[in-house]
Amino acid sequence: MGKFYQFIIEQREKHMEERDERDAPEVAACSFIDRQAVGGKSAPTESPPRLQLPMPALQLLRLDHAPALLAFERENRAYFAASVPDRGDEFFAEFDTRYAQLLAWQAAGTDYLHLLVAEGGEVVGRVNLTEVADGSAELGYRIAQKAAGQGLATAAVCKVREFAATEYRLSRLRARVTQDNPASRKVLEHNGFVAGGSLTLNGKLAMSYICELR
């Protein structure tokens, strides 16, 4: 998937350069193009000539995603634990029960849980909207270690932000990031999130972010 990630980097740099030249605050256009639209609806598509491998599909969580998601969490457990609290052995022991609860929350409309699914069905990332209420939701994401640092997070968050406004009819997204995670802060800032007040998150100094969609 190296060519895909190189394409993401090139597209992000291109959009950042164009934005700087315009000296305008607009958020760069999404460079992530999903192959399977959320809810079965059509989504904007592009066919960049340099792209020779399929991009990961942005998909809403389904029952049949369970094995791939479990593998994703297991393979990246130590990597994730370096920046966020470890889920603990209990999470994996009770995965089936917890997974069913996630699907129930999504069916109830309180959560929109997205996976980045590569060719072959491998999960390489998650971008979730949780605590959906009154036109607002909390955004959170995690990307596989082998896919980190390549611009995939920025592109995926951009696409979910679009879905939040158009598919889910939300007007505001919230996010929280610890001060020792500058990469995540950059992802949010590239996607139009504005820093708010400081807070404590899992015992660490953190910052709240807001993105107005309307």
Residue ranges and their predicted role:
Residues 61, 72, 90-97, 108:
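Generic, well-ordered alpha-helical segments
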Residues 90, 101-115:
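A short helix-loop-beta-strand connector motif used in the catalytic cores of GNAT acetyltransferases and
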Residues 97-101, 108, 167, 192-193:
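Short alpha-helix boundary/capping motifs
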